[in-house]
Amino acid sequence: MPSSGDAAGRRPHVVLIPSAGMGHLVPFGRLAVALSSGHGCDVSLVTVLPTVSTAESKHLDALFDAFPAVRRLDFELAPFDASEFPSADPFFLRFEAMRRSAPLLGPLLTGAGASALATDIALTSVVIPVAKEQGLPCHILFTASAAMLSLCAYFPTYLDANAGDGGGVGDVDIPGVYRIPKASIPQALHDPNHLFTRQFVANGRSLTSAAGILVNTFDALEPEAVAALQQGKVASGFPPVFAVGPLLPASNQAKDPQANYMEWLDAQPARSVVYVSFGSRKAISGEQLRELAAGLETSGHRFLWVVKSTVVDRDDAAELGELLGEGFLKRVEKRGLVTKAWVDQEEVLKHESVALFVSHCGWNSVTEAAASGVPVLALPRFGDQRVNSGVVARAGLGVWADTWSWEGEAGVIGAEEISEKVKAAMADEALRRKAASLAKAAAKAVAGGGSSHRCLVEFARLCQGGTCRTN
């Protein structure tokens, strides 16, 4: 429990409790480094064991090796029978296993001597009660967009108001923000009995009990959503909201000595390369991969493409030639590099040769594109990615054809459509200028005295006080 000495000059000890998935884990690592290196906090990062993927294990090992000031707190999950949810996504299962193990966190927190907690949105409703038992303030790090945070905060109210009408989930008009169309609502939320829906609603209802909410965004990227959340327009009794993004990648983590993609980029002309990546979690169907390959080929542009053909860590034995169509790699070898290996995305986006990012619009990818000033061609596949694509289009960071299909919908996006969108985006100087202006705004936000920097300073100050919000 926090003592009076915490408020009298001792460094606050902030314990961060992330959930599963690189999209959740990466921003927690970045927050840990920021707080420990620039904001006078002692920081511990809870590592949940076993991890859900080898990518998570490697990321955590690299983080702790590079930043020994961030302390590691291992937390073993209680046994969990996943057969209760036979067809659930591996990450939704991990969220549930972590939620059921949360009551066991108490002894770990007591031994750590924490003065404040920050946990993931996926664990909100189960970690806040544990924090209250310990007399600790519990903040939330929301790892997606402010638009998605506003949906999470308002969705329980929306469901309550529409209960019994039998019409299912439709367009959601979020007070102070804007309308999120039915087609952009994450697929799982259309099923009231889905495991993720139950988790999402429980966590949304619990947000008003948090001490504060940090969100990885900045004012210029999401002005409406940030303002509405901070002004309490989305939900009554909402805690303080701190827009602390873009949370920047740690700068001294080890690079892969075997990687050759940077050498390839170095050999390309300035602003000539299309970078293509769809994140670490989901695979794209074979048919869609081949259409994308054909679209990139007929666009005529250079490209670096990171191909993922499996879900999580399932065996990935397929050869690239088999995945992308006969003869494709040979035909594009002089202007395209295709790899199944991990790349340092932030390093790629900062490279002067990269002119466009064809992305699924996972939120980390969006913030990294904004910080780098690289325009985005949005190709969302599932979850919050259509909401994020809407943010990209509204901010002028990129373009999104909102009629394109995504996971669970019939049809694929054709090669000709992809080719035309790539060519148009590569030729759009106004789009390039807007992306560059957002990069300047992002840099200003995180610099000393900027809006995001001030929010982190205020968060650290609150952690120093060690007070517990009890509403």
From Swiss-Prot:
User: Mind telling me which Pfam families this protein's record contains?
Assistant: UDPGT (PF00201)
Q: Specify the enzyme's EC class, one word.
A: transferase
Q: Where does an anthocyanidin bind?
A: 24, 383
Q: Which reaction does it catalyse?
A: a 3'-hydro-2'-hydroxy-beta-oxodihydrochalcone + UDP-alpha-D-glucose = a 3'-(beta-D-glucopyranosyl)-2'-hydroxy-beta-oxodihydrochalcone + UDP + H(+)
What EC number(s) are associated with this protein in UniProt? 2.4.1.360
Highest taxon in the source lineage: Eukaryota
> Which SUPFAM superfamilies has this protein been placed in?
UDP-Glycosyltransferase/glycogen phosphorylase (SSF53756)
Q: Where is the active site?
A: 24 (proton acceptor), 120 (charge relay)
Q: Which PANTHER family match?
A: GLYCOSYLTRANSFERASE, UDP-GLYCOSYLTRANSFERASE 708D1-LIKE
Tell me, in a sentence or two, what this protein's role is: UDP-glucose-dependent glucosyltransferase catalyzing the c-glucosylation of 2-hydroxyflavanones.
Q: Which family does it belong to?
A: Belongs to the UDP-glycosyltransferase family.
Identification of the protein by name? UDP-glycosyltransferase CGT
Q: Which organism is it from?
A: Oryza sativa subsp. japonica (Rice)
